[in-house]
Amino acid sequence: MIVEEAAEILEGQLVAVIPPSVQHLIMIGDHKQLRPIVHFIRLKKRHHLDVSMFERLVNCELPFRQLRYQCRMRDEFVDLLRELKLYEELKTNDKVIA
């Protein structure tokens, strides 16, 4: 099963749609960007509902792969992201025209 934008999905919603027959779960997303939207502030704070299952697994240091080469941004943006220590390993693909 492949889950796109996994960092934006509430953990309960994700668990609810995983059928018992699933042998592999591939989650794609960016845990450093958008988080799940929770409208009940008290529940969100008390139970950390704004942290997705994807982010929890990354924070628990389970094995994951991170994008190393990007093909959409200008080099200046990539340099800024590295300076801010958000994506220190990120590089621009040689074929990017900017």
Tell me the role of every PLM-derived stretch:
Residues 1-98:
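Conserved helicase motor core of SF1/SF2 NTP-dependent helicases
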